[in-house]
Amino acid sequence: MSLRFPERAGYEKLGYRPHAKRVWVHDPLGLTRFIMRQLMMYPLVLPFTFPFYVPRS
């Protein structure tokens, strides 16, 4: 955490980095965390959408 920007302390705790767009390509760990965060939301959506995708025979 950067002590030079105390007003951004809250954003840094949330994982927000102002230079994320520059380091994004060179940060596979950040990319993996982003993918895992996206996948964590799917168990909340799949139980509601799954019955509609099941083909009725």
Curated annotation (Swiss-Prot):
Protein name per its UniProtKB record: Uncharacterized protein US33A
